[in-house]
Amino acid sequence: MISRSLFARLLLAPLLAPPALGSEPGTMLAARVVEAAYVGTIAPLPPGAKRAEVWIPLPSTTPFQDIGDMKISTPFPATVEKDSAGNAVAHFTVEDATMLGGKEIEVRVTFRVRRAEVRAPLGRAAYGAPAPSKVPPDASPWLGENRMVPLTPRVRKQAAELAAGRRDAVEKAQAFYRYLVENGTYDKTTPGWGKGDSERFCDVKKGNCTDFHSAFMALARAEGIPVRFVIGFPINPESEGTVPGYHCWAEFWAEGAGWIPVDASDAAKSGDPEKRRYLFGNLDPDRVELSRGRDLTLSPKQKDGPLNFLIFPYVEVDGKAFSETKIRLEYKNA
């Protein structure tokens, strides 16, 4: 495997240039620093494959995580671009698939992350009186529909019923959160889970983190509240380990406070009332963000339609999506 780390670091500098940690509203308390490695494995390409393109999500610095010392290892030269939601993405091309000799492809992104706890100021005095008509330009893209998150008459009716009597974005979002936490079941056995299909979740009220937060997105957006989808990895409290799967959460926007996090699926899994209260407006530092957004257009643009969300390596073989990929996050406390 050929390391492209120096080339990638030079390209990453302008793409990952951060706002100051904690520059958005909210209070940072606990923090955690870990050395991490995102490992993506792509199964052997199908017989007869000629050309493949691969896109890899890269962690970015945000107001609540600092990313440093990033190194990208790929079997072919990679460039770093931004997708339609502003996520940093590494891209490389396999011009001749026979060069792989029927073997799998492994990509590895190592980095150091300082992740801070998020505590949003949920008091009314901090928020003022949010008004959907005053949504700032950078929040407006998060108001519309996604393919898996349509704003149907049913969801608009349900959102209006849940929001009745609520005075502002925070109270409405809290009503949606409580409804999902109290009525939803975290479940990865019922067919159709994991796609982030909000209509399915409304029908069965079961699913994983993607499904819970898609339902939250639909309800909040139906009431004119911007919501963005965030996906990454959970990090166990232990000092080191390997995480074989992703985790996601959401952030809604309220005037006077900015983006406020919610983790409805973790709350639904917990029977602890205090944890359920905490996960509306607060996040522990035991997670790493990889990307944001749904229906993503990558760079260079993929051929097989918008990408539902980005956490796995995205692969196109001769212009068609190839989904036989796996991920894991290896980490240890720094």
Spans of features found by a protein language model:
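N-terminal export leaders
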Residues: 2-11
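Hydrophobic h-region of N-terminal signal peptides that target proteins for export
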Residues: 12-21
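Intrinsically disordered, low-complexity N-terminal segments that are enriched in acidic
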Residues: 22-119
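Sec-exported extracytoplasmic/periplasmic mature domains
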Residues: 46-47, 59-63, 114, 160-167, ...
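Acidic low-complexity segments
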Residues: 106-186, 192-203
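Low-complexity, Gly/Ser/Thr/Pro-rich intrinsically disordered linker/tail segments
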Residues: 283-334
